[in-house]
Amino acid sequence: MYLEFPAVWRYFRDYIEASGGILELKKALDWSVWYAAKWWREIYDAGAVNLKKPFVKALYLSLRAKNMIGEDGRPVKEVKKPELPKGLYAREWVEMHQQFDELGAVKVARDEVDRNVLDLLFSDIQTMGWHRIMVKAFLRACEETDGHAVLEPYSREGHLAQLYIEDYKPESYLGYDPNPSLVEVARQVAPGAVFTPVSSACQLSGQFDVVLLVEKLQWVADPLRELDCIGRLLKPGGRLYVAQPNVDSMPGYLAILSAIGAQQVYTWKEVENLLTLRFKLEKRLIKTMPFYGAIYVKPRSAEVRR
């Protein structure tokens, strides 16, 4: 994970500086590992391991990738409690993990935490300073410009649309989400965009220049079908901006996202393999930190892709 610091510095310099610098950022990321190890031990000791639960699966795969637990789930490596970072956004990142920790990892693993509480935490994360600057830095790394017709899958409360419209002037912006209540909230949060309550891109029409898959793939129950339908809506030469937390990145953050209604848990390579079945990889920005980030394009030719 830390081997990617040079690439992160290149594309996410604002994010690093806002966190207080490289050393402060590393302290913050160390907390994500520490909390993940803590939550796993609590779940393991309570006999609450069920790998069918995305939250539990995310912890298991992340910690296995770091050789911190055995195949049977038994912890094999202790993690020293990190030093608290001093940077504002780095501290905010740690506090997010603390908020989730207060819910109780075992209760989350057993589905004993009210879903509304988890949804509220997710909404809070979208408005945190570290998350806002991270997403804005990612869009700049994609060299996004004005004038695009934009599609956002699983738009939830509209916070990504709000961020996008702060910096860009799209020709149009359409978000879709299966939850009508969230669509109503999104219309208030980002009045400059349009939102519709549908469960899939397969129910939509139109043509788009850009699709924002920023922390989205974990929600999709049937990703190949959804990507097929997204592909039909994307103009030839249109681009997908993909930012996907994965088991090779920040384990605590991935676990938090996975606890909030996730359908899938991916490695970065699984994300790439999935997307290249339907689209062409134009540029990989980063593999793991703070997420897998890449730009994909719909080929202009009509040839059938394998």
PLM-predicted stretches and their roles:
Residues A186-R187:
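Conserved SAM-binding loop
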Residues M1-E95:
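N-terminal accessory segments
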Residues P245-A262:
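Short, glycine-/aromatic-enriched active-site segment of Class I SAM-dependent methyltransferases
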Residues L224-P236:
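A short glycine-rich, Lys/Arg-flanked "PGG" loop and its adjoining helix->strand segment in the class I
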Residues E157-K169:
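Conserved SAM-binding loop of SAM-dependent methyltransferases across substrates and taxa
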Residues G70-C142:
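Conserved Class I S-adenosyl-L-methionine-dependent methyltransferase catalytic core
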Residues G237-P245:
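Conserved beta-strand signature within the Rossmann-like core of class I S-adenosyl-L-methionine
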Residues V210-P223:
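A short SAM/SAH-binding and catalytic strip from SAM-dependent methyltransferases
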